Swiss-Prot record:
Stated name of the protein: ATP-dependent protease ATPase subunit HslU
Top-rank lineage group of the source organism: Bacteria
Compartments (UniProt record): Cytoplasm
Pfam family, one: AAA_2
A biological process from GO: proteolysis involved in protein catabolic process
Residues binding ATP, per UniProt: 23, 65-70, 266, 333, 405
InterPro entries: AAA+_ATPase, ATP-dep_Clp_protease_ClpX, ATPase_AAA_core, Clp_ATPase_C, HslU, P-loop_NTPase
Metal-binding recorded as keyword: no
Entry-linked NCBIfam families: hslU (TIGR00390), PRK05201.1 (NF003544)
Self-association state and partner proteins as the record states: A double ring-shaped homohexamer of HslV is capped on each side by a ring-shaped HslU homohexamer. The assembly of the HslU/HslV complex is dependent on binding of ATP.
Gene Ontology MF annotations: ATP binding; ATP hydrolysis activity; peptidase activity; proteasome-activating activity
Length: 455
């Protein structure tokens, strides 16, 4: 089940958490927060009624770079739920070359199993660490085989007092890191992997073949000489894998996939039929993708290698810029399956100022931390932040509006010289102010032709 600390969060708390990473777009945050809370509400209902309550899927409408994808990604992290992001343009109607839409659910099941397997390994980690220590101690202190019919397992359970004292001493040294550089010889499990190239649309077959060949090679091991420091994580991972019950993991993962899975479909507008385009082959293919998506969103059974997944209660969040098409250009059946529509607003200069400074991992904080690794202390004056936001807004207005992604382009250009010279400026402090910004970017901003190609 999802993390109990986050699954009981109220919509207000979810929005506050999203505010730490994403600037503005309050309506979209409210919509996803309510959708997430409704999942918790549904799980509190009696089973008979619970099965009747369907998720209210969300359609996000807004230009590129305003936070559509980031909201969905942060929401999945927050919910600790199986999450997969796909582009609608990667899929084609059944019968055409391209990915089958059912692959979305198979990918979601894969993600869910990986998530729950890692959680199961965390739960048995302490036990796995003890087993790994025993393996290392056995390599350091081989037990003496004496007598006919010697049983090594019995000897392990009832060691002599002298052996026991020695193991206790070595275990203490091992935990203190005093033996990290000592080499030992171990039998390590071999992962038999094989690269299989498959043509477009046959990725699933390639995946099944890879799994088949890896299963054929499972159980094999090889002797390797490693330092204890390098061997310990390998042994912990191997022992944790032995302790985890794979059947329980798969059962829990499939249930979580069905009840808590989130699918984010980006660029849904690219498979909408353009109203003014007339009826042509491209439109037929696009409509076919929508019709193939429809059973997944409505609720159907999809076969995966872990078992059958029912999609009735999976939350679907679709997004698109809808520059050339309108939401009403989607087929009516699909429109009806996305009852909640949220319009995200284009970003302004004030939004850019906040994006540069407010989020937990704001862009300016990232660049300051990157250059600090070279010993350069970088700081941005407030007038520089204002000027950068103004430049990004101007360029977006004059050219294609790519939202907050414009800030990446502007900052990379601004710090180009400093990033190149950083290794030679160890110990220096650099303050970026409005004058520095104008010196580096002023000419580009004033010349529309230059800014079109460089910014």
């Amino acid at each position: 089940m999802p993390n109990p600390d986050t699954s009981t969060m109220t919509p207000r708390e979810i929005v506050q958490e999203l505010d730490r990473h994403i600037v503005g777009q309050h309506d979209a945050k409210r919509a996803v927060a309510i959708a997430l809370r409704n999942r918790w509400r549904r799980m509190q209902l009696p089973e008979e009624l619970r099965n009747e309550v369907m998720p209210k899927n969300i359609l996000m409408i807004g230009p590129t770079g305003v936070g559509k994808t980031e909201i969905a990604r942060r929401l999945a992290t927050l919910a600790n739920a199986p999450f997969v992001k796909v582009e609608a343009t990667r899929f084609t109607e059944v019968g055409y070359v391209g990915k089958d839409v059912e692959q979305i659910i198979r990918d979601l099941a894969d993600t869910s199993v990986k998530l729950y397997r890692e959680q199961a390994k965390v739960r048995v980690r302490n036990q796995a660490e003890e087993r790994a220590e025993d393996c290392i101690l056995d390599a350091l202190l081989p037990r003496r085989a004496t007598g006919i019919g010697f049983d090594p397992e019995a000897a392990r359970n009832e060691p002599s007092s002298q052996e026991n004292d020695t193991r206790i001493k070595f275990r203490r040294m091992l935990r203190n890191g005093e033996l990290d550089e000592r080499e030992i010889e171990l039998e390590v499990a071999v992962n038999a992997s094989m690269d299989i190239m498959t043509p477009p649309g046959m990725e699933e077959m390639g995946q099944q073949l890879r799994q088949m060949f890896s299963n054929l090679g499972s159980g094999k091991s090889q002797k390797r000489k490693l330092t204890i420091k390098a061997a310990r994580p390998l042994l912990i991972e191997e022992e944790a894998g032995k302790l985890v019950n794979e059947d329980d993991v798969r059962t829990a993962a499939i249930k979580a996939c069905e009840q808590h899975g989130i699918v984010f479909i980006d660029e849904i507008d690219k498979v909408a039929k353009r109203g003014e385009a007339g009826s042509n082959g491209g439109d037929v293919s696009r409509e076919g993708v929508q019709r193939d998506l429809l059973p997944l969103v409505e609720g159907s059974n999809v076969s995966t290698k872990y078992g059958t997944v029912k999609t009735d209660h999976i939350l679907f969040i679709a997004s698109g810029a809808f520059h050339l098409a309108k939401p009403s250009d989607l087929i009516p059946e699909l429109q009806g399956r996305f009852p909640i529509r949220v319009e995200l607003t284009a970003l302004t200069k004030a939004d850019f100022v906040r994006i540069l400074t407010e989020p937990k991992a704001a862009l300016i904080k990232q660049y300051e931390a990157l250059l600090q690794t070279e010993g350069v202390s970088l700081t941005f004056a407030q007038d520089a932040v204002d000027r950068l936001a103004e430049i990004a807004a101007q360029v977006n207005e004059r050219q294609e509006n790519i939202g907050a992604r414009r800030l990446h382009t502007v900052l990379e250009r601004l710090l180009d010289v400093l990033s190149y010279e950083a290794p030679d400026r160890d110990g220096q402090s650099v303050t970026v102010d409005a004058a520095y910004v104008d010196a580096q970017l002023g000419e580009l901003v004033q010349d529309p032709d230059l800014s079109r190609y460089i910014l």
